[in-house]
Amino acid sequence: MLNNLSGPVAQDILVDEPNEGDIPVLIVEDHALLANTLVIALSAEGCRARIADLSSVEVLLQQVRTFRPGVVLLDLDLGRLGDGVAMVKPLTELGARVLVVSGTTDRLRLAETVELGAVGFLSKQAPFEQLLSTVLDVVAQRPVLSTARRYELLADLRAARAIRERDLAPFTTLTPRERSVLAALAQGQRVDTIAAAAVVSEATVRSQIRGVLAKLNVNSQLEAVALAWTVGWFQAHP
């Protein structure tokens, strides 16, 4: 039966007319089968369930303002809409209780959603009965994440950030020119190319490279670039 639902995502499937006290549920999910199955199952439980329009972030937020969902089921990998983590805060600010339903196994990414206001998260790999039960708990405003678990996740997130800040500290000592040279080296540019682009001598560029190596406490250009990738410096300075 579910195979018949694998076509284009329906924008709205309402099984019954909503009764008083129904809680609107918005499903922010681009997987058609899962989204449509959730709509049918939740509608059968008396919820007004609707699939979000994912044509743009602006359209999605306008739909939230109009539909006023009490609960939003949020995937984190939204294709052209980008990272769903960034959607948690604006959705909660619009009054929704956000439950993350995602295939990600990145513990810190999930912890960040909790920090931003999500009431909990559940893997897409969980049995559908568990997923439905968890959603209904959120609808009923029952906790789905214990205080201890929440504290543990946020503590892990703080620890990871402290480590990253420590690892990035040497890079903060680089001058703007040294940062540019390091970025150029990561792109595979040669000393003469870097010098020509900056209209400086090759000796100047080599001096700047020596400065980079000394500040990062590495012995070669390759090590400097590898370290920058490892600690996420390029991601922080695109």
What is the meaning of each model-derived region?
Residues L2, V9, L213-P238:
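Basic, Lys/Arg-enriched C-terminal extension of HTH/homeodomain DNA-binding domains
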Residues E29-H31:
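Conserved acidic carboxylate
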Residues C47-V57, Q63, V218:
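Short hydrophobic/Thr-rich beta-strand motif most characteristic of the beta2 strand and flanking loop
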Residues L74-D77, S102:
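Active-site residues of response regulator receiver
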Residues G82-A96:
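Short amphipathic alpha-helix used as the core "switch/output" element in two-component signaling
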Residues L110-V114, G120, K124-T172, P176:
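Short, flexible helix-to-coil linker/hinge segments that flank and couple to helix-turn-helix
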Residues A162-T204:
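Helix-turn-helix DNA-binding segment
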Residues G188-E223, L227:
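Recognition helix of helix-turn-helix DNA-binding domains
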